Amino acid sequence: EGFGGDAYGFGLYPGQYGMALLSKYPIDVDDILTFQTFKWHHMPHPQVPIIPDESGSTDKGKPWYDVEEWAALRLSSKSHWDVPVKVAGKTVHILAMHPTPPNFDGSEDRNGKRNFDEIRLMADYLSPDKGAYIYDDNGEKVSLSENARFVLVGDFNAADIGDKHREGVIEQLTEHPLVNNDIIPTSAGGAGASGAEFSNRFTAYWGARADYVLPSRFGFDVNDAGVFWPAKTSDLYRLVKDREASSDHRLVWISLSLTEDN
């Protein structure tokens, strides 16, 4: 039908909206973990999409997915990764994901619920006591080790403020005790893109902080951070001026220094 809603994740062809990681540091390929095939119903207390009744209540509503669909459906709409990278003798876990946007659905809120649980999967993975249910694409139970250095990266499709903010979603990560969200990346271009007082933190031209680079509190000092979104007066604005130039999202960067393990 020209639409990708009949796939595990939206796409008009296999691999659309795929993920890639480029690193100037060596990647520990043998220890990469992926969670693409983790079944949504295997998450404890998942946010099951329910079609509301005529009154708007979901108490007696019908599940959006039938039994066969729900049993087969993956949680990850693209993939979830734990990629260990070796930096100066230390291991840094790149925790990457691209959850589905929380819209393009109906009153059952299937994409909103999936976005919440995709983010929850990564939040639970940070805490072995909460993530004991998680298995990788080899079917092995896995968790992040205590005092691991990590950086969460990706288009999380979850705003932290404004009219696109859904309370309690991105906070699963930004307010997680192991995650450092103290420095919020900003840009001059974002500041001029909207009248909102917080628009300097936007990472997408449609007005939201949707893309994140969140380091662990353990193991790093944060030197600086920003969003590559030049102001219209900059010579570099040509790189982001429209969709013909580049993405509707902006590059988010952070400068980190390794600290001692103790």
Spans of model-derived segments:
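Active-site His/acidic residue clusters
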Residues: V92-K113
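Generic beta-strand/beta-sheet core signal
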Residues: G18, L95-M97, V153, P215
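Metal-dependent phosphoester-hydrolase catalytic domains
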Residues: K24-H45, P52-E54, L75, P84-V85, ...
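Short, structured coil/loop segments at alpha-helix boundaries
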Residues: W70, D105-S107, D163
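Structured beta-strand-rich core segments of catalytic domains in phosphoester-bond hydrolases
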Residues: E1-T91, P99
